[in-house]
From Swiss-Prot:
It comes from the Eukaryota. One of its GO terms (molecular function) is lipid binding. This is Uncharacterized protein C1494.08c. InterPro entries: EEIG1/2-like (IPR039931), NT-C2 (IPR019448). GO terms for cellular component: cell cortex. Pfam families: NT-C2. Residues 3-141 form the C2 NT-type domain. To yeast YBL086c.
């Protein structure tokens, strides 16, 4: 039990949590709220929820902010044990179905120990939709031993791992779209719009042939940079440096996969064909 662990091996951190918004919600009515808790901590300060806000243009905004104290444990190998923040995105449509869970997000707080403040979008897990939640987290140690290791540091934004994953194989997006399409028809128009956007984005990335001798970005980094408003170039390009990307296996692979994706409207058309 943690009560028998020396105080020096139970460092305390001040967690600042900001919940900004959830976007790409395939609903036109209803209210959305987010419940959060810190796994393994049952005190009142370690769980709360945002206000329930209405869906407007497939988005809900809160700008919710809170600050809590979190105690972690350093094990015998001098490793800071994982401590998870869990967020559930819930929807109340004011119907007989009651409150339903749109998705969940599980974040390992130990990854934020050496990061400071960070704000990013995450693709919801355990979900049939492609909604993303934008949150901000900062973690500051206030007491205890600071001589410890962490098992994993914070990597690239998960939402972008999710997006490039969609561009790489498309399996998760197709699975979610299939489930939406074969259910009650909820948000099929939204799902098709989302797929059109992804296919168009992938096609543009392929056509641009953004490989150059002076570009330090690989294909994945090019997509990441364009998604966040960049040009896809590590440095301003020179026309003379642009090379023919016809033999680029990564871009060819993207093009093949892009052609293999099927939109809901295309499914209907195929069913109608003799």
């Amino acid at each position: 039990m943690s009560i028998f662990i020396p105080k020096a091996r139970r460092p305390t951190f001040e967690l600042h949590l900001r919940i900004h918004d959830v976007v790409n919600i395939p609903l036109i009515t209803g209210v959305i709220f987010v419940k959060w808790n810190i796994e393994g901590i049952h005190s009142r300060h370690a769980n709360d929820q945002t206000e329930a806000e209405p869906v407007l243009e497939h988005r809900v905004t809160w700008e919710y902010e809170t600050c809590v104290s979190v105690r972690m444990i350093i094990d015998n190998d001098n490793l800071l044990k994982d401590k998870f923040l869990i967020l559930q995105v819930l929807c109340d449509s004011h119907t007989d179905s009651g409150v339903i869970r749109l998705g969940i997000l599980k974040i390992n707080l130990t990854e934020y120990v050496y990061v400071g403040q960070d704000t990013r979008k995450y693709l919801l897990a355990d979900s049939k939709i492609n909604a993303t939640i934008r949150i901000g987290i900062s973690l500051k140690q206030t007491s205890g031993n600071k001589d410890f290791r962490v098992s994993k540091t914070l990597g690239k934004p998960q939402v972008f791992s999710g997006l490039t994953g969609l561009l790489t194989d498309g399996k998760e997006l197709k699975r979610r779209d299939d489930e939406v399409y074969t259910s009650t028809g909820l948000a099929s128009a939204w799902a098709e719009k989302m797929l059109h956007s992804i296919k168009d984005f992938n096609q543009k990335t392929t056509v641009f042939h953004m490989h150059t001798r002076n570009n330090k970005y690989d294909t994945r980094e090019i997509v990441d940079d364009i998604f966040f408003g960049g040009t896809g170039w590590a440095e301003p390009p020179k026309i003379a440096d642009i090379v023919d990307a016809a033999g680029d296996t990564d871009l060819i692979s993207l093009e093949i996969r892009q052609k293999s994706w099927v939109l809901p409207s295309e499914k209907v058309l195929n069913k109608r064909l003799p």
